[in-house]
Amino acid sequence: MNTRTVGWFEITATDPDRCRKFYDGLFGWEFTEAEAGYWTVAGPGSSSMGALRSGDRDELTIFVVCEVAGTLSHLESLGARVIASPSRTPAGDLQAVVEDVRSNRLGLSSSGTPVAWFEIGTDDPGATRKFYENAFGWTSERDEAAEGVEYYSFLAPGAEQPIGGIFAGAGDYAIPGLLVSDVEDVLDRCERSGGSRVMGPVSDGNGLTIGQFTDPSGNRWSSFAVPSGG
């Protein structure tokens, strides 16, 4: 389906001013209002990578595809359910929303800038792996370095490095991931700024450290740090 990777995210907040202050303090993110109640999000000195929407809709991890309508039909044939048909966002991108076979909400977009990682939590890893492999032509491999947990990495066709992963037995969710220099520092500052620590930090056998947090509005993230020289 010519899917590249996760290329956008969308978070929501009933108190967007508080949300913007949280991310500005945590990561220095910049918010540009595209229309009332909708802001694009960019890291310091970088292009837009996501959006903040006023409201209480579920956050979205958004996959960049070459053809939104065609991908939507393909996912429906695999058991996905359409939540929102293709329409233009205030940022101008064509976007649709589906639920995967575990009822995780995903976005499909016509454009975007790849984010560092994404993670799919599932209590049925077999069905989840099959869905995403058939949906986007990815392969999944067991991460043997992830000691004590069942974790799989996704690879896109022709890719040398994984683009995301499946965490088995961790409940059902679909969240974007952020590359950070110090996971414990991010989790600590998140808590002091009104967010919550969901898990971690934990490290695998290769020295990769991960953690999860939610912002004050409940938007959930994975964060990870690679070992020095990694």
Name each region found by the language model.
Residues 27, 78, 134-136, 193:
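Residues at alpha-helix termini
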Residues 19, 23, 75, 103, ...:
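Conserved active-site tyrosine of GNAT-family acetyltransferases
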